[in-house]
């Protein structure tokens, strides 16, 4: 897979270009060269050290760029790597099937679970089909239908959050976008089954919250969670979207800050360089977290599960 490098990764690009060139020479060389192998080893070591240095000191704006990376794993990628026997369920039984939300029953280590998440799309045609991962009311009502089904059949619910926000179009507003989001918040807070929410890319405002109320809320290391995009915040406060980097720093939208404020429960480590560099390893890290948290929640009866969730929600703002 050819990677799209971000601006702050330019020093890494130069090294990896040299490494790839040497690999090509080595691959097509008729006689092995010890000097070539040694130089390749030194460059790979230098590249690794450079990656560690750059990614150990990322600013909020750089993290926001990583969260939006076009090759970052999406919900369907996690379904492929973590779950088996996925049966997708479609439609809200009222208006339409919103492709920006995918969901259905799958198995996690042999156990039936309900998986729901945003899906952005990669190629142009798929992006349009998925509405760039911005759900309309019918998408959130589909998610609600699946969550209520999961409760009836006593299946844990696992959500994957990755959206710039709920779709703000006129049609969406006419069909009750805010009502759909509000109802999801209300219902999710009272579901009698374990709910684990994972912010895996962008966690944009109510569009993220509508599938983000749970017993555990996790964030991938380079994901973001905020009430508005940095560009939107900059446009409002400074009347200048170019001040998005300053806005990102001020908003506290990165995982460590949100963990400090106790708005999320756990930060899931990503491979060096970001989740887009290794989908499989990222999925393994997410899976390990899900299994551990499900085991914790399984020990609670319905009453204690709901009380724990209630206390979690009531503690917001009191850290």
UniProtKB/Swiss-Prot annotation:
It is an enzyme of class 2 (transferase). One of its GO terms (biological process) is malonyl-CoA biosynthetic process. Residues 35-296 form the CoA carboxyltransferase C-terminal domain. Pfam families: ACCA. One of its GO terms (molecular function) is acetyl-CoA carboxylase activity. It is found in: Cytoplasm. Component of the acetyl coenzyme A carboxylase (ACC) complex. First, biotin carboxylase catalyzes the carboxylation of biotin on its carrier protein (BCCP) and then the CO(2) group is transferred by the carboxyltransferase to acetyl-CoA to form malonyl-CoA. Acetyl-CoA carboxylase is a heterohexamer composed of biotin carboxyl carrier protein (AccB), biotin carboxylase (AccC) and two subunits each of ACCase subunit alpha (AccA) and ACCase subunit beta (AccD). This is Acetyl-coenzyme A carboxylase carboxyl transferase subunit alpha. It comes from Vibrio cholerae serotype O1 (strain ATCC 39315 / El Tor Inaba N16961).
